[in-house]
Amino acid sequence: MLLQKINSPKDLKRLSIDELKTLSAEIREIIINTVENNGGHLASNLGTVELTLALHYVFDTPEDKIIWDVGHQAYTHKLVTGRAKDFHTLRQFGGISGYIAPWESEYDHFAVGHAGTSLSAALGFAKARDLKGEKYKVIAVIGDGALTSGMALEALNQIGYLNTDLIVVLNDNEHSISPNVGAIALYLAKLRKHPLYRFFKQTTQNLLKNSSIGKGLLAFDLKLERSLKSLLLENPMFEYWGFKYFGPFDGHDIPVLISVFKGIKDNLSCPVLIHITTKKGIGHKDAEATPSKFHSIGAKIEREKKVPTYTEVFGKALVELGEKYPEIVAITAAMPEGTGLSYFAQRFPERFFDVGIAEEHAVTFAAGLAKNGLKPVVAIYSTFLQRAFDQIIHDVCLQKLPIVFVLDRAGIVSDDGPTHQGIFDLSYLRLIPNMVISAPKDESELRDLLYTAINYPGPFAIRYPKSKGVGIGLKDHFERIEIGKSEILKYGKNVLILAIGSMVYPALEAESILKTEGISPTIVNVRFLKPLDVLTLEELISSHDVIITVEENVITGGLFGAISELVNILKLNKKVLPISLPDKFIEQGNAQLLRDIYGLSGHKIAEKIISVLEDVKV
C-alpha cells in the first residue's frame, strides 16, 4: 500500500498524479473500514480526500498552516501526517481524536470541534505572522455549512478589510450535517449551476489538467475566470468583501487542485477565496446517496431490543403536541435529524425553521416569535447552546419569554471528545434568572416535562443524554408536572442521595448494591435544578446524616452547588458530598467507560458511598 510509505506530507511530494489517485482510493477504504468499526464522521471525510492531499502536496506543512473548520473532515489529514499506524484507535479511549488536536501532532495547529471558527483563528495566525516578520502561508478550510455561521461572516468582513495574505478554501458540498439552508446556500448554488459558467469551468479544467501550465498561463486563466464571473453574477459577494475569488473547481480532481493551489501560492499575497465543489460521501454508495444519515455513525454493536432514544421520544412527542397546540414552532441550527425535529418538519413544514449553523440567531429569532404570541421550541445540542449564552440571558430570560430549550446530548457524549461533551449546561443555565431547568429520569418523564414546558409562561430548559431510554413503557397521554417538584423514589435512613436526570437510574442501581451491605439510602429524583423543591429538600436534608448529590455535569455550579447553597442559606449544618464530573475537560471514550472512570456508574456510586460512610462512621 502506498500509505505505508507516507510518514509525513513531504513523502506526498514524491508521488506522481496517478499515485496520488491510487492513494486516494486506499485512504477511502481505510476511512470506511475504520469508521464502520469505531464510529465517526464518514460522509464528510470521504468528500475531502483529494482536497487534503492536494493541500499537503502544494503547501509546505507544518510551516504553512492549515486551519480546519470543525475538524470532522480531517481524517485524511491525520493519515498523511504520521498517524496512519494509530488510525485504528480513532475516537477510542486513549486513541487519536476524531477532530483536530494540537496535543496530538505539530500539523494540528488549532483545536476545533464547533463550526465557524477557522476564519477567525486563521486571521489571528496570519496577523501574528505579519507582526513577527515571518513568511509562511495560512490556509483556512471551511465548509459551505459553516460559512453560514455569524462568526465566519464576521471574520470574512475583517479579513477583507485588513487585506491580509490569507487563503480561504471553501469546501462546498451543499451540506453541513443536513442540507444547507439560507441565502448563502442559494448564492453558491447559483454559482455552481449557471450553464455558461459550467461550460467555462469544464474548458478551463481540461486546460489545467492537460497542459504544462506556467505561472503566466495560470494567471491569465484565473484573470479570465474572474472576468467571466463578473459578467455572470450581479453581486460577486466575496469580491465585495475584499477577496479575490476563484472557482468553483472540482474538489475531486487532483491535477486541477494542485495547479490552482500552486498558482495562487506563487502569485498572490492578499485575501483569496478558492471555491471547490465536492461530493459528500463519495466512494461509499449509501453515504453518497444519503449523506445526512452517514454524517456521523456509531460503532458496530450487538443489536439490542428496540428501545427508542431520548431524541426519538422527544421528536415524536413534539409532533403530538403540535397537533394540539398550533402556536408551537420548532427551531434548530442545522440539525433536524440529530435533534429529532425531522418528525416535526415533515408534519408541520411551515412551522419548522432550520436556521443553519447559527445558534445565536436561532435563540433571538425564537425570542421574536415568542414575543409575537408563538411557542418556540429550540432544539440544540448542549455543547452548541453555549454559543448562544448572551442571547439566552439578554433576549429571552430578561423578558421572561415562553421558549422551550431542548438540550440533546447533555452529559457525557461518548467518542467525540472534549469539544462535544455536554457537561456544562446545568452550570451555565442555573446562574440565569427566570430560567426553569429540568432533566428527566427516563423517556416517559421527558414527555411529561415537554408537555409541562409547553404550558409554562416563561423560559424552560430540558436536558437529556445521547442514549436510548431506560426501556419503560410510554403512556398514551401527557401529565403536567408541578414546577420545581422533586420525586422521592426510595425511603431510607441516614443517607440521602439526590440525583438528577441521567443519574437517577444509576443511583437506584447503587441503592440495590448498598442494600446488600445493610445500607438503606433515600433516593430522590431532583428533576428540577431550578427552582429547587425547597420544602421537600429541607425536610429530607434535616433528617439524614449524609447528603450525596449525583449529576452528569461538572462539579462547579450544578446540582452540588445548588444543594450546598441551599444548605448554607437554610443553616442546616450538613455537609454535602458530590458525585459529579471533575473540573476538567473530559476526553473521548465510550460513555459507559467514562462514567466508570469518573465514578458515575451504579457500582461506582455505591463504592463511593460505602467509602464515605466508613470515613464518617455512620
Curated annotation (Swiss-Prot):
GO aspect biological process, one term: 1-deoxy-D-xylulose 5-phosphate biosynthetic process
Pfam family, one: Transketolase_C
PROSITE patterns: TRANSKETOLASE_1 (PS00801)
The keyword Transferase is annotated on this UniProt entry: yes
Binding residue positions for thiamine diphosphate: H72, G113, H114, A115, G145, A146, N173, H284, E359
First-tier enzyme category under EC: transferase
One GO CC term, this protein: cytosol
GO terms assigned for molecular function: 1-deoxy-D-xylulose-5-phosphate synthase activity; magnesium ion binding; thiamine pyrophosphate binding
Cofactor(s) this protein cannot do without: Mg(2+); thiamine diphosphate
Record's keyword terms, sorted: Isoprene biosynthesis, Magnesium, Metal-binding, Thiamine biosynthesis, Thiamine pyrophosphate, Transferase
SMART domains listed in its UniProt record: Transket_pyr (SM00861)
Pathway: Metabolic intermediate biosynthesis; 1-deoxy-D-xylulose 5-phosphate biosynthesis; 1-deoxy-D-xylulose 5-phosphate from D-glyceraldehyde 3-phosphate and pyruvate: step 1/1
Subunit architecture: Homodimer.
UniProt name for this protein: 1-deoxy-D-xylulose-5-phosphate synthase
